[in-house]
């Protein structure tokens, strides 16, 4: 999400925050970070989480418009700059991973975005970039912590669920929101984030109790998006609806925001089929690509993977993008969005929406671009 003074910060009394600059729809001049590719993206689940009949095969694609602001202590302790400290302080073996409450923070940071992927849950969070202008603003920390605590809450709930009991993703997100508030407020770390997540579950057949089918619980706050594509019909069977306060100011969770999961999050339940592809995307994707462009790119990536166009050597069935194809799907979609984002003359959905609001805008929208692609498969584990 771009640095936008039109975020919820603009609604905060000036007695709490410094004066905000006037919003201008001018092209940002951030130097793009190197695109990052990850071979393994599925996080390890807790040992006591039950095995479900279905699972996700996942892949991610990330592009950051600028380097993320480093997490502050105690979440990340940077090495001292004093030459009087022991040399071990600066040694490469020193642990620079991010922690909260003694645990490694799950997921990956991408500029102000954060993503998470596991066998049963994926999410994409978009931190509000305007916090980068505040000395204690850490939107990237907020987006990462919400994903971390949300995934933990979902796994804890899943471990305690009775058979056939439905999950409650809004309650899990509310718990994550409250834990993030507690963790950041005590250290004066400010920020807000939008979020979307998709939790995979299942249901029993009405007539044949031995028959199970996959079900997806999708939860959204703001303008990230979950989209479900059925390659067998080449159709989008579901996508979330963006939530706005006003143009370019989505609903968001965090410092000084009136939005909360219990009050503003929307959850939908979708019947899935094995082979369906679930996407969790930041607005860096949907602001630069129309729906039909996303669908076309996904279908092409899957077809290329099935035909062996990609050079990666993967054993096993490649049908529908299995055994590594989701990594290619996510990276290809990220690359398609990036090409538009950096093109000052491209036509984009964001440009179209801005013009509808009477605002001057041209080209793509340079933003952090985060994609999590997940393929629904039977769980043979």
Language-model-detected regions and their locations in the chain:
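PP2C/PPM-type serine/threonine phosphatase catalytic domain
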Residues: 2-381
């Amino acid at each position: 999400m771009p640095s936008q003074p039109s975020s919820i910060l603009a609604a905060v009394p000036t007695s709490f925050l410094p004066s905000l600059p006037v919003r201008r729809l001018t092209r940002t001049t951030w130097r793009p970070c190197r695109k990052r590719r990850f071979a393994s993206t599925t996080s390890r689940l807790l040992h006591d989480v039950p095995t479900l009949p279905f699972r996700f095969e996942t892949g991610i694609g990330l592009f950051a418009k600028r380097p993320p602001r480093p997490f502050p202590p105690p979440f990340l302790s940077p090495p001292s700059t004093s030459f009087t400290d022991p040399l071990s302080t600066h040694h490469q073996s020193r642990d620079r991973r991010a922690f909260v409450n003694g645990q490694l923070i799950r997921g990956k940071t991408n500029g102000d975005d954060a993503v998470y992927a596991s066998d049963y849950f994926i999410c994409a969070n978009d931190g509000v970039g305007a916090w980068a202008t505040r000395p204690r603003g850490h939107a990237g920390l907020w987006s990462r912590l919400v994903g971390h605590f949300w995934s933990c809450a979902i796994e804890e709930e899943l471990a305690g669920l009775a058979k056939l009991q439905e999950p409650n993703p809004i309650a899990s997100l509310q718990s994550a929101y409250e834990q993030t508030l507690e963790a950041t407020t005590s250290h004066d770390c400010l920020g807000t984030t939008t979020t979307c997540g998709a939790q995979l579950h299942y249901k029993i057949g009405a007539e044949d109790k031995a028959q199970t089918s996959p079900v997806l619980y999708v939860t959204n706050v703001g303008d990230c998006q979950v989209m479900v594509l059925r390659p067998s019909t080449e159709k989008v069977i579901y996508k979330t609806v963006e939530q706005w306060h006003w143009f370019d100011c989505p609903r968001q969770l965090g410092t000084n925001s009136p939005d909360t999961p219990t009050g503003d999050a929307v959850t939908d339940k979708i019947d899935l089929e094995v082979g369906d592809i679930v996407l969790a995307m930041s607005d860096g994707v949907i602001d630069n690509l129309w729906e039909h462009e996303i669908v076309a790119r996904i279908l092409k990536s899957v077809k290329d993977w099935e035909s062996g166009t990609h050079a990666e050597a993967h054993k096993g069935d490649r049908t529908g993008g299995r055994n590594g194809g989701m990594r290619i799907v996510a990276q290809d979609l990220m690359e398609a969005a990036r090409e538009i984002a950096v093109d000052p003359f491209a036509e984009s959905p964001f440009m179209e929406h801005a013009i509808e609001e009477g605002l001057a805008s041209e080209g793509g929208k340079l933003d952090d671009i985060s994609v999590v692609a997940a393929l629904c498969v039977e769980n043979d584990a």
